């Protein structure tokens, strides 16, 4: 989740209570990974046999881009017993609700089948856009809230937020607005997750490296397999 596909293409051409599954006492961990169109041919069987149990797959970006590999990746993950979900690369300089609706229409939904993760908003900078997409901290917070509330209204779950401590500090002023309602996917490529930003008491997932042996980025769930299954089911 380092560069958007749109960025690369452009460069080449020129409040509700936290769900019950959000458990405060974490035990163990589960390996997973995230992928996008840069990894079109993942060997999901090998990844599962290698110990991975969940995967996050890029579905959409903005309101015009849908990953051409999403459907095959999602099917491959499903057929190989993964808990899986879609993520949306956010462009907070355009409508939050329009982006949420586009995400939901193109793979970002959630159901309580026990194998579907709630959708994830990928919040990070990208080339060709000003810092924080030109938004003030208050405007960025309002954008995230509008997207999250829309997702919750449509699915009954809040989406996850993927972000780094630096981005969160710079673009939201380290707001604590979402710390008790929205699961955190912490981007920190280090030997330990450290202290979560904002008001989060803990991370739910940790992107601990920008490489993974079966493709994409390494992700670790902050809990055991039973907790991951309950989290996916939403209760």
From Swiss-Prot:
Entry's Gene Ontology molecular function annotations: lysozyme activity
Keywords: Antimicrobial, Bacteriolytic enzyme, Disulfide bond, Glycosidase, Hydrolase, Secreted, Signal
Occurrences of domain Ch-type lysozyme (ranges): 29-235
Entry-linked SUPFAM superfamilies: (Trans)glycosidases
Cellular component aspect of the GO annotation: extracellular region
Disulfide bonds: 132-171
InterPro entries for this protein: Glyco_hydro_25 (IPR002053), Glyco_hydro_fam25_subgr (IPR018077), Glycoside_hydrolase_SF (IPR017853)
PROSITE patterns to which the protein is assigned, alphabetical: GLYCOSYL_HYDROL_F25_2
Subcellular location: Secreted
Keyword set includes Secreted: yes
Family indicated by similarity: Belongs to the glycosyl hydrolase 25 family.
Name by which UniProt lists this protein: N,O-diacetylmuramidase
UniProt organism field: Arthroderma benhamiae (strain ATCC MYA-4681 / CBS 112371) (Trichophyton mentagrophytes)
Taxonomic path: Eukaryota, Fungi, Dikarya, Ascomycota, Pezizomycotina
């Amino acid at each position: 989740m380092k560069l958007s596909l749109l960025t690369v293409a452009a460069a080449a051409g020129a409040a509700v209570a936290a769900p019950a599954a959000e458990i405060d006492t974490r035990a163990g961990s589960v390996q997973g990974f995230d992928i996008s169109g840069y990894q079109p041919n993942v060997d999901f069987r090998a990844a599962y046999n290698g110990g991975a149990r969940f995967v996050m797959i890029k579905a959409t970006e903005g309101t015009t881009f849908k990953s051409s590999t999403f459907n095959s990746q999602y099917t491959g993950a499903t057929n190989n017993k993964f808990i899986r979900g879609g993520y949306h690369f956010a462009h907070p300089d355009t409508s939050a609700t329009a982006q949420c609706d586009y995400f939901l229409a193109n793979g970002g939904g959630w159901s309580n089948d026990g194998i579907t993760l709630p959708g994830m908003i990928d919040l990070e900078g990208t080339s060709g856009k000003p810092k924080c997409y030109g938004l003030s901290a208050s405007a960025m917070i309002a954008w995230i809230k509008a997207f999250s509330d829309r997702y919750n209204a449509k699915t009954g779950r809040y989406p996850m937020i993927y972000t780094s401590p630096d981005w969160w500090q710079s673009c939201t002023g380290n707001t604590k607005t979402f710390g008790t309602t929205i699961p955190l996917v912490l981007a920190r490529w280090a030997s330990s997750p450290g202290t979560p930003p904002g008001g989060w008491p803990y991370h739910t997932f940790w992107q601990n490296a920008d490489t993974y042996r079966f493709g994409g980025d390494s992700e670790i769930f902050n809990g055991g397999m039973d907790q991951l299954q309950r989290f996916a089911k939403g209760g």
